[in-house]
Amino acid sequence: MYFNIIEAVYSDKFRIDLKFRNGKSGIADLEKYISDGEIFTDIRSIDNFKKFSVEFGTLTWNNGEIDIAPETLYEKTTGEKIVFENIVKKTG
């Protein structure tokens, strides 16, 4: 997919440097995002947060039990709002 992550490197605190399939890259600050929702409880400690991997084009933790949609990560990294109509036109 257009927004799949192809590379992820831990930066600091709750920040990860991401590179996307479409060539865009940047740092996603996920501290506020993971502070809500019971699903993220396990990765609210820095030690657990650092244990991410890239699977199926997105970030996952705990062997895939926790993930964040690549579109969400793209928006948080680039600041660009995704409009799916434009994606269909680009990818045809």
PLM region spans:
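Motif-centric detector for short Cys/His coordination patterns
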Residues: 1-92
